């Protein structure tokens, strides 16, 4: 996550509401001297702002890290709906900064805007946490509380986004420009620290702590909510130390009105008798000053280059949705640590901290020494290509995962597994209505196999005839089956005879890295088995079959079991990621219950570490595209237009999330094909952007009405420097 994108307040390092960038307004009151931090040139008030930002980023990213799995496993939405709502929320977080900037510029000022919208932010966390308490109402109430909470959070985080960093910049005197430069570096580090820590911790709160016998989403949302309360309290504590510039007018609104007036005026004066004007924006000259029109002209040249950018964000922001769902189907055991699927996102902020200085101090300098003109637009194009490669790698990983997933029966098909609990080998023959053998198989006693036989039906539902041979016994049974289901035929001795029962199997690999288990009780007593904080699992006597129960991956050496007159312990051993187990309780010994363990569906075998290459590629793409993009944009835009440019940049991110939302709902593609689609779309967009960049003529500083010398952002490692220099590409 870099200082400009992927985080909602990272983009505010050059704020749309900076007082330095506004058109001339009413004179500001003289700035008062503020106490310094430990005798330095830093205002003491900066400490409150930096701590506030750390807590707010912890709050936002901590909540967002577990959001997709909350939709999937708490609200029980499907993957497409979960992805769509996730990106709709992300998109809303990028639309609301325009509202926050307008409120701060035109009405309340930055300080009051941060305070009031932080209260809205906290209220959103309250609703979100209440919507994650299982005993509070039903699914409808949980959904309503969650959506209301997310809407308030989007308004809060987006609204304060364009204000916090700029408000910190307002605290410095003009003669302390170097200290202000270091402030932006510290501010950026606080953002990534909050993101890094929260993305690692909140999945642990969700998965390792149990609430009401389930994953503790209420705690995973509640702790970020408390951090937002802390952020608000800390920020308010510094109130008397802050410099609070008054609102000076909304430049975004002025630019919008100027463009709209020019368009309307042009259409009102379409007569051939009226002389044409050199540029379509010149039609605003009747109402707006020349310097504003010149600035808007410079702005539109850059906005034209922004047209292809949303597709890049469409790929980048899927780390928290589609890539988390992919990690959900992989083996998180790294040997020294078990990684939760939603913890993989922690790689992004960690790699950003490594890559920004690496690229700036090593890679870019080496390329420069080779005599290659690696311009800003070329860096952005290479960033797009790296994102394409990241999704191509993600597609390959998805294909590999699909090859390991247990297949599902198609139309007019069933899968059948025979489980032999007798003392010797049995022969099974399955026949259809036409007495044609669908299956002939010999099964050893207690044979552990994950093999399912595929049987073709004549209709959607059908009666099948089972012929069992055991020693000198021959038994015939008839069972009804339905298409697209998996079944287990359980065969066992019954005195001197042979009995069987057909049990419907789940046939589906447990999601979220969970383990699914069920029991067959061969004893003559009913049994209750306590696996977790939920109600005990009941298993009837004499080959009773329990329901499936999903539990966390791990070791279960002493599971509590009860009959009506005794208590036992049962060692289940290691239960692995994504596995379905059957335990057949066979007898009682001095050491407790004895059970035979069968693996019906094998574990997730592909390590989650295989996602590392795609995360490395997409983070490198983010550093090259996002950091460079704003550096280029700000070097090419007049200072009065930087706020509008910031709003436009955020809008490209919002549109990118909308693209993902649309594709998730309407593409109908399998996941690996969707990854390939996004990769190909971005490749096409990259070619278009490259052509646009080839014909782009850098704007000379002399071509702007402003002075030749101006402040433009310069990125140096993870430092954000405001240097005075000529505007050159």
Swiss-Prot record:
GO terms for molecular function: dipeptide transmembrane transporter activity; high-affinity oligopeptide transmembrane transporter activity; peptide:proton symporter activity; tripeptide transmembrane transporter activity. Expressed in kidney brush border cells (at protein level). Highly expressed in macrophages. Keywords: Cell membrane, Cytoplasmic vesicle, Glycoprotein, Immunity, Innate immunity, Membrane, Peptide transport, Phosphoprotein, Protein transport, Symport, Transmembrane, Transmembrane helix, Transport. Gene3D superfamilies: MFS general substrate transporter like domains. Its main location: membrane. CDD domains: MFS_SLC15A1_2_like. Disruption phenotype: Decreased dipeptide uptake in bone marrow. Decreased cytokine expression in response to LPS stimulation. The modification Phosphothreonine is found at residue 12. The chain crosses the membrane at residues 58-78, 88-108, 114-134, 140-160, 184-204, 218-238, 296-316, 344-364, 381-401, 612-632, 644-664, 675-695. The modification Phosphoserine is found at residues 9, 28. InterPro entries: Alpha/beta_knot_MTases, MFS_trans_sf, Oligopep_transport, POT_fam, PTR2_symporter_CS. Residues 1-34 are annotated as: Disordered. Glycans are attached at residues 448, 472, 528, 587. It catalyses: N-acetyl-D-muramoyl-L-alanyl-D-isoglutamine(out) + 3 H(+)(out) = N-acetyl-D-muramoyl-L-alanyl-D-isoglutamine(in) + 3 H(+)(in); a dipeptide(out) + 2 H(+)(out) = a dipeptide(in) + 2 H(+)(in); glycyl-L-leucine(out) + 2 H(+)(out) = glycyl-L-leucine(in) + 2 H(+)(in); glycyl-L-lysine(out) + 2 H(+)(out) = glycyl-L-lysine(in) + 2 H(+)(in). It is found in: Apical cell membrane; Cytoplasmic vesicle, Phagosome membrane; Cell membrane. The keyword Chaperone does not apply. It holds the Pfam family PTR2. Residues 79-87, 135-139, 205-217, 317-343, 402-611, 665-674 are extracellular. Residues 1-57, 109-113, 161-183, 239-295, 365-380, 633-643, 696-729 are cytoplasmic. It is a multi-pass membrane protein. Interacts (via extracellular domain region) with trypsin. Belongs to the major facilitator superfamily. Proton-dependent oligopeptide transporter (POT/PTR) (TC 2.A.17) family. This is Solute carrier family 15 member 2. It comes from Mus musculus. The gene is Slc15a2.
């Amino acid at each position: 996550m870099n200082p400009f994108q992927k985080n909602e307040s990272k983009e505010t390092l050059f704020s749309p509401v900076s007082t330095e960038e506004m058109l001339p307004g009413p004179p500001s009151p003289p700035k008062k001297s503020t106490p310094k931090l430990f005798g330095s040139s830093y205002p003491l008030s900066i400490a409150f702002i930096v701590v506030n930002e750390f807590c707010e980023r912890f709050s936002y990213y901590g909540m967002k890290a577990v959001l997709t799995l909350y939709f999937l496993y708490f609200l029980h939405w499907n993957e497409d709906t979960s992805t769509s709502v996730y990106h709709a929320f992300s998109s809303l977080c990028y639309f609301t900064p325009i509202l926050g900037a307008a409120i701060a510029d035109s009405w309340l000022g930055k300080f009051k805007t941060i305070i009031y919208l932080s209260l809205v932010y906290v209220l959103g966390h309250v609703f979100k946490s209440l919507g994650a308490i299982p005993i509070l109402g039903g699914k409808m109430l949980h959904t309503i509380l969650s959506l209301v909470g997310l809407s308030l959070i989007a308004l809060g985080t987006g609204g304060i986004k364009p204000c916090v960093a700029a408000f910190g910049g307002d605290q410095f005197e003009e003669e302390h420009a170097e200290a202000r430069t270091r402030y932006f570096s510290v501010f950026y580090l606080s953002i990534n620290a909050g993101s890094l820590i929260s993305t690692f911790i909140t999945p642990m709160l969700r998965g390792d702590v149990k609430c009401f016998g389930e994953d503790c989403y209420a705690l995973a949302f509640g702790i970020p909510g408390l951090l937002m309360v802390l952020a608000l309290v800390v920020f308010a504590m510094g109130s008397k130390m802050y410099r609070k510039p008054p609102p000076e007018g909304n430049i975004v609104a002025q630019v919008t009105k100027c463009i709209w007036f020019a368009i309307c005026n042009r259409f009102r004066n379409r007569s051939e008798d009226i002389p044409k004007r050199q540029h379509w924006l010149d039609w605003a000259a009747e109402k707006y000053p020349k310097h504003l029109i010149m600035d808007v002209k410079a702005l539109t040249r850059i906005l034209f280059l922004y047209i292809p950018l949303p597709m890049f964000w469409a790929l980048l922001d899927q780390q928290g949705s589609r890539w988390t769902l992919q990690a959900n189907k992989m083996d998180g055991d790294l040997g020294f640590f078990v990684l939760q699927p939603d913890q993989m996102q922690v790689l992004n902020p960690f790699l950003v901290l490594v890559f920004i200085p690496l690229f700036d101090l090593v890679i870019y300098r080496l390329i420069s020494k080779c005599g290659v003109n690696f311009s800003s637009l070329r860096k952005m194009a290479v960033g797009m290509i790296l994102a394409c490669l990241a999704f191509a790698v993600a597609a390959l990983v998805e294909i590999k995962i699909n090859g390991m997933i247990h297949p599902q029966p198609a139309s007019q098909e069933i899968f059948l597994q025979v489980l032999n609990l007798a003392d010797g080998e049995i022969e099974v023959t399955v026949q259809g209505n036409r007495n044609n053998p669908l299956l002939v198989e010999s099964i050893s006693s207690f044979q552990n196999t994950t093999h399912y036989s595929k049987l073709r039906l004549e209709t959607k539902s059908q009666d099948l005839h089972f012929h069992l041979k055991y020693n000198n016994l021959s038994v015939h049974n008839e069972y009804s089956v339905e298409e697209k289901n998996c079944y287990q035929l359980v065969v066992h001795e019954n005195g001197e005879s042979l009995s069987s029962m057909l049990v419907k199997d789940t046939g589906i690999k447990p999601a979220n890295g969970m383990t699914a288990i069920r029991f067959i009780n061969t004893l003559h007593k009913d049994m209750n088995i306590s696996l977790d904080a939920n109600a005990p699992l009941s298993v009837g006597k004499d080959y009773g079959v329990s329901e499936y129960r999903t539990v966390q991956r791990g070791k279960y050496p002493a599971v509590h079991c009860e009959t009506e007159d005794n208590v036992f312990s049962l060692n289940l051993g290691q239960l692995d990621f994504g596995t379905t187990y059957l335990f057949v309780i066979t007898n009682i010994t001095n050491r407790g219950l004895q059970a035979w363990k069968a693996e019906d569906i094998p574990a997730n075998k592909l390590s989650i570490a295989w996602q590392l290459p795609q995360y490395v590629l997409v983070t490198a793409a983010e550093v090259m595209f996002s950091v460079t993009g704003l550096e280029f944009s700000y070097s090419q835009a007049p200072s009065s237009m930087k706020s509008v440019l910031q709003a436009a940049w955020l809008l490209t991110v919002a549109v990118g999330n909308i693209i993902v939302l649309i594709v998730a709902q309407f593409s109908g593609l399998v996941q690996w094909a969707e990854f390939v689609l996004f990769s190909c779309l971005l490749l096409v967009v990259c070619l278009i952007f490259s052509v646009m960049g080839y014909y782009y003529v850098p704007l000379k500083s002399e071509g702007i009405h402003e002075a030749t010398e101006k402040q433009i952002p310069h990125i140096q490692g993870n430092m954000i420097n405001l240097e005075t220099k000529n505007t050159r590409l």
